[in-house]
Curated annotation (Swiss-Prot):
Biased composition (Low complexity): 1107-1128
Protein name: PAN2-PAN3 deadenylation complex catalytic subunit pan2
GO cellular component: P-body; PAN complex
Keyword Cell membrane included in the entry's annotation: no
InterPro entries per UniProt: Exonuclease_RNaseT/DNA_pol3 (IPR013520), PAN2 (IPR030843), PAN2-PAN3_catalytic_subunit (IPR050785), PAN2_N (IPR048841), PAN2_UCH_dom (IPR028881), Papain-like_cys_pep_sf (IPR038765), RNaseH-like_sf (IPR012337), RNaseH_sf (IPR036397)
Domain-related comment: Contains a pseudo-UCH domain. This ubiquitin C-terminal hydrolase (UCH)-like or ubiquitin specific protease (USP)-like domain is predicted to be catalytically inactive because it lacks the active site catalytic triad characteristic of thiol proteases, with residues at the equivalent structural positions that are incompatible with catalysis, and it cannot bind ubiquitin. It functions as a structural scaffold for intra- and intermolecular interactions in the complex.
Organism name: Aspergillus terreus (strain NIH 2624 / FGSC A1156)
Residue span, Exonuclease domain: 872-1048
Domain of life: Eukaryota
Residue ranges with Polar residues bias: 1096-1106
Recorded name of the encoding gene: pan2
Family to which the UniProt record says this protein belongs: Belongs to the peptidase C19 family. PAN2 subfamily.
Cofactor binding notes: Binds 2 metal cations per subunit in the catalytic exonuclease domain.
Reaction(s) the record says it catalyses: Exonucleolytic cleavage of poly(A) to 5'-AMP
Length: 1159
């Protein structure tokens, strides 16, 4: 050690994770090939540092954390070898793993060393066997038994190995037998080093029956003569030792307190002392060049000592491979106006390295095949992992191409958008409308003949164009009169179950009667079902969505805790999830029914199996009886031999149904008489069967699955008799015989439908469909059953055999619904005559907010009747922005449209004395996060929908929706602008016969443009709407918009009666094309649209509105005066208002709106 040696660097040992504390270095070693210092820690990680500055180079987790600390590091020309208690690991110096060796007999490895063969290492420890490992192959080549527990090894003339008792054995390098053994220290050897013919050891001894202390002597042995030499005295306590790599008799001895001594073994009096600034030293190592010394301490630091003038770890080191220096491009002044070609591309004159020739591209290492989710219910713990019976979905020895892109795209090719079809038809010859209708009627799934029967079971997905969902061709998937349900809504996996419940007449009747009652509870699932069922019936084959119902379903904390929401289904199969949802739905609608009719047992008669459970202790015979009513019965399958199922009547569906309804189970429960847990028997006795029997298939075993695969196993009719506390079930010929014999008490059920999980193993995600016999719920008797498949919005007719056949592995029954045969066609529509309309005639508010002054609640003599016109306008806020996928070519595809929430509803009287006066103006409270209030268009500002801060009349969505639903079922006609979009966002289905949309009234057949309400107001009345002063950003006013739509409709009726509709539309569109279909600025002047040949002038009134003044039209046909409409008069689209002054009747109405251009 030269005189200028000093501490050059000090770095902390890197922590095991970014947020963890530093850890101590358990071993340090200098690399003999490159300028690297390697450090191992207590978490199995080894890290290298480059050069005297100790720059971090590589870091690798070589051993699992459970194996503890890294005990030793060795260096080979090919890589770095590390040792932990249970494994040996080799990596390249860049960090790539070469091999990892572990063995069941490796229980406590402590040390390793090279052998006489430089491509082999021997590893040993406190265990009874040593291993020889081939470095080139990374395999164990020999196992050697030993009677010693070795803790340290150093290779020289002999293989010197220290034991856990303080001895040191000299082992032969050829056969590893013990040649010589010394008792070096009393307790343990702490450190040792061997070089050439010398061995130096440091250790602990026990003195005066105390704890072990460091020996003040470092023992020296001559390996040539196998004899001890005089020890080296070191009063500070010799804890660590290293031999100098160049000076054969010089060694470094260090104490635990940091004192360093460089001593000549042949001349102990020649010493050189240094003091390292450490609190507690844990180890030292000297570089192969002898110019650097590394120290690790208990404060998680690594110190590097050496001469500042010269320091190299090796004499001849290989160059360390470092990352290429990235040359930064020249700075560029980047702005939105900078063209992209300014970036440029690099110049190259040779073939690019990335241009691989095809003959050099190979597929290596295919990814593993994905686990079939259908196996999850059948998994059972095994000795290693889990196991399940082979579903045999592939042929023997068939290899799956796992490199195929695992897309979840639907197998059905989506049809063209309606706008694309319109453009194509417009380019064809005349008669394009008829050709388009014929092409649409002949369209088949996938655009061709339906050769593959699995196509209709595939996933269906809505595609969106820039025109939104209205541009999607739903009729491509549904040519029936039964509506499907859309899929882009959270928890829409329940669509199949909702369809099944809708086609059960007795459930449908209960839901609709409850919806027509006085229930205004916000989270009433039964009301939402009634609204949905009514919407599906009114749609008559048009697509619908269960948005409001699923939003209510998502709001239940019980559903979230049960894990049946879509966000919790990652590790649950759809079949088990939908069965849990079935139990939750029926339990919740029973609760909702009791909130309005607590004393009625109507729902229990329809859905509940009335039963009692007797629990008997098998030890003392004590018996307890308690109610055992259930809304859902779960099928229980017996243990069976599948070979005998076909001819064993005990395995028929009727017998399994009987055993499931009247079940007997054995369990362990608390006995009050014995005062301990005892084996108990539980028996269920049925007293009354429901009118609707809901069953969960509960297919959890392969044997039960094979039972369902038997053709015809599921009957479409079953009979049940309760006789003397016993339940008897019949099917097939047995049932027909008892029906003919008029068996007393026999209840015949017919199968309404089945919810089925479809899991086609061709990169399709599992989904649910339902098979339903729609003939049962038809209002008129039908001669035969008609089965339909409901696959979300794909609806098609199927035959009965296909619906009830479950021998395909991808088709799993989940939920079954049976209804008494006497209730076939029992569609009760008396709820329409018993609507509770109280909500329309009284105020309802969450916050006591004041409605607008112009709003007047309906009076009793204003009760709406069929045909009563009502002007409607709504405002919405954005709850979610649209999800857009930008493709590589720059094109954009809407994956999921923006989600809107109803924020305001305004309804105005369309006739009578108070014509044009609003009676509904409700703001709707929204609990979901609002991402954009779109105030410019909605007029809704932050705080308007919060009950704590809003000054408006706030109501729940349920109340606002129910008011509109009541008006709809009272037969009112809704007048508005763009009503289709409003109805869709409100999630209500209004027949076309009850809709007057001015967007379609003022539509020119030869023009592909729909006019805005703002432009129409100016074009027809020369009035400006949807405008506010420049310093105000209030946005639209729904009352103003609804009132203008009502006026436009009545003006259109005037045009229609005068026979000038086409001329007026031509004039409106001609003027609009000049102005860009926008109103001109207020300070501009323009001619008022009038009948051809009529001169019109414009005058600016003090009111701020441009009111036209029209002189008498010469030669114009006489127009009779009109009489005001009244609520009692029947509504007719053409003659609800005859041409007249174009104003609303009632006091002051003329001053409010101004005159008509036709006056």
């Amino acid at each position: 050690m030269e005189a200028d040696w000093d501490e050059l660097s000090r770095i902390p040992v890197p922590p095991p994770s970014p947020h963890a504390l530093p850890t101590v270095a358990t071993t340090i070693a200098f690399d003999d090939v490159m300028e690297l210092l390697w450090v191992g820690n207590e978490y199995g990680r080894i890290t290298s540092f480059y050069g005297p500055e100790l720059q971090r180079y590589t870091s690798v987790r070589a051993h699992p954390v459970a194996e503890g600390i890294v005990r030793q590091i060795l260096f080979h020309e090919r890589g770095v070898i590390s040792l932990s208690s249970r494994s040996v690991h080799m990596i390249t110096r860049r960090g790539l793993t070469q091999w990892h060796v572990a063995h069941e007999e490796m229980v406590d490895l402590r040390c390793m060393s090279f052998t006489a063969q430089l491509n082999r290492v021997i590893v040993a420890g406190c265990q009874k066997v040593m291993f020889t490992i081939d470095i080139d192959k990374g395999v164990i080549v020999d196992k050697l038994p030993t009677e010693y527990n070795y803790t340290m090894m150093k290779k020289s003339r002999y293989l010197c190995a220290a034991t856990d008792t303080g001895s040191v054995n000299a082992l032969s390098l050829s056969d590893f037998r013990v040649v010589k053994s010394w008792k070096a220290h009393g307790t343990a050897v702490n450190d040792m080093d061997a070089r050439n013919d010398l061995l130096v050891t440091c250790g602990f001894s026990v003195r005066h029956l105390g704890s072990p202390i460091v020996d003040p002597l470092a023992n020296v042995y001559d390996l040539k003569t196998l004899s001890p030499l005089p020890p080296i005295p070191f009063h500070a306590g010799a804890a660590y030792v290293r031999m100098h790599p160049k000076l054969s008799t010089t060694s470094f001895v260090a104490s635990q307190t940091g004192q360093l001594q460089v001593v000549d073994l042949m001349n102990p009096n020649s010493i050189n002392l240094r003091q390292a600034n450490v609190s507690f030293m844990l180890g030292i190592d000297i570089s192969p060049s002898g110019e650097a010394l590394a120290i690790n301490d208990a404060e998680c630091m690594v110190h590097l000592w050496g001469s500042p003038a010269k320091i190299h770890f090796n004499e001849m080191s290989k160059e360390v491979e470092l990352a290429d220096v990235t040359h930064r491009p020249p700075p560029l002044d980047w702005s939105p106006d900078t063209p992209l070609n300014m970036i440029g591309m690099p110049y190259y004159h040779e073939r690019l390295f990335s241009a691989w020739p095809s003959h050099l591209v190979f597929e290596v290492g295919s990814p593993p095949a994905p686990i079939d989710t259908g196996l999850i219910p059948y998994l059972r713990p095994a000795e290693i992992g889990h196991c399940a019976p082979n579903p045999k979905k592939t042929r023997r020895y068939q290899v799956e191409n796992t490199r195929a892109v695992a897309t979840t795209e639907p197998a059905l090719i989506a049809p063209k958008f309606l706008s694309e079809k319109a453009r194509e038809q417009s380019k064809k010859s005349d008669g394009s409308v008829a050709e388009a209708a014929g092409a649409l009627a002949g369209a088949k799934l996938n655009g061709e003949a339906e050769d593959d029967p699995l196509l209709k079971y595939s996933n269906v997905e809505i595609k969106y164009s820039r025109f939104g969902v209205d541009d999607f061709d739903f009729r491509f998937y549904n040519q029936t009169n039964f509506s499907g349900l859309e899929t882009h809504i959270a928890n829409s996996f329940t669509n199949a179950l909702l369809q099944l419940l809708k086609f059960i007449p007795l459930v449908r009747n209960v839901a609709l009667h409850h919806a027509a009652s006085s229930c205004v509870f916000e989270n009433c699932l039964l009301c939402e079902m009634g609204y949905l069922f009514d919407m599906l019936e009114k749609a008559n084959g048009q697509n619908c969505q269960a948005t409001n119902l699923l939003k209510t379903f998502s709001s239940f904390r019980e559903a979230a805790s049960l894990g049946i929401l879509e966000e919790n289904l990652t590790n649950k199969s759809l079949s088990s999830a939908i069965q849990a949802v079935n139990r939750f739905f029926l339990g919740q609608i029973a609760h909702d029914f009791r909130t309005i009719m607590p004393n009625s047992d109507d729902l229990e008669q329809r859905l509940a199996t009335i039963a009692s459970e007797s629990i008997q202790c098998r030890y003392c015979g004590n018996e307890i009886v308690r109610p055992g009513n259930s809304l859902v019965n779960e099928l229980i399958y017996p243990n069976m031999d599948i070979k005998h199922t076909r001819r064993n009547p005990a395995f028929r569906f009727s017998n399994i149904l009987r055993a499931s309804i009247e079940r007997e189970t054995q369990n362990k429960g608390w006995c009050n008489y014995c005062r301990r847990y005892q084996p108990v028997g539980i028996r269920k006795s049925v007293h009354r069967m429901p009118l609707v029997m809901m069953l969960n298939a509960a297919l959890n075993t392969p044997m039960a699955r094979r039972l369902w695969a038997i053709p015809g196993w599921l009957p479409d009719e079953v009979g049940i008799v309760i006789d003397g506390g016993q339940t008897l079930c019949y099917e097939g010929e047995d049932l027909r015989m008892r029906v003919q014999a008029n068996m007393p008490g026999l209840i015949v059920y017919e199968l309404v439908g089945v919810v089925t999980e479809i899991d086609i193993p061709e990169h399709q995600k599992p989904h649910l469909v339902s098979f339903i016999n729609v003939a049962i719920s038809s209002p008129e008797p039908q001669p035969q059953n008609k089965w339909h498949l409901f696959n979300d919005f794909l609806v098609t007719e199927v035959d009965k055999d296909e619906a009830l056949r479950f021998n395909q592995p991808w088709k799993v029954p989940c939920v079954l619904a049976f209804q008494v045969k006497d209730a076939r066609h029992a569609m009760d529509d008396s709820w329409k005559d018993a609507l509770d309309t109280t909500l329309l005639f009284r105020d309802w508010s969450l916050n006591g907010g004041r409605p607008v002054e112009s709003r007047v609640t309906l009076s009793e003599d204003e009760k709406p009747t069929p045909g009563t016109p009502m002007a409607l306008d709504t405002e919405f806020v954005d709850l979610e922005k649209a999800e857009i996928d930008v493709k590589a070519d720059g094109s954009q595809e809407i994956v999921r449209p923006s989600k809107s929430g109803l924020a305001r509803v305004s309804v105005l009287r369309g006739s009578g004395v108070r014509e044009g006066v609003p009676f509904i103006d409700d703001y709707i409270t929204i609990k979901e996060p609002i991402v954009d209030y779109v105030t410019q268009y909605s007029g809704i500002k932050p705080g308007d929908l919060d009950p704590r801060t809003s000054e408006h009349n706030l109501v729940p969505l349920k109340v606002a929706y129910k008011k509109l639903w009541l008006l709809l079922n009272l037969g009112c006609v809704f007048v508005g602008h763009g009503l289709a979009s409003d109805f869709r966002k409100i999630n209500i289905q209004v027949p076309k016969s009850q809709t007057v949309d001015t967007q379609y009234l003022f539509f020119h057949p030869g023009k592909s443009r729909r006019l805005s309400l703002r432009y129409l107001a100016w074009a027809v009345f020369k009035e400006y709407i949807q405008e506010e002063p420049a310093d105000n950003n209030e946005g639209h006013d729904s009352i103003e918009d609804a009132r203008m739509a009502l006026r436009l409709w009545k003006k259109f009726l005037e045009y229609e009666d005068a026979g000038i509709v086409s001329q007026m539309l031509e004039e409106i569109f001609r003027e609009g094309s000049k102005l860009g279909f926008r109103p001109p600025p207020r300070n501009g002047t323009a001619a008022v649209l009038s009948r051809p040949g009529t001169a019109v002038t414009m005058q600016n009134t003090n009111s701020g509105r441009n009111t036209p003044t029209v002189p008498d039209a010469a030669g114009a046909p006489a127009v009779p005066a009109s009489a005001p409409t009244t609520p009692g008069r029947g509504f007719r689209r053409a003659d609800a208002l005859t041409p007249g002054d174009g104003t609303f009747s009632g006091p002051g109405a003329g001053d409010f709106f101004g005159g008509s251009p036709l006056k």
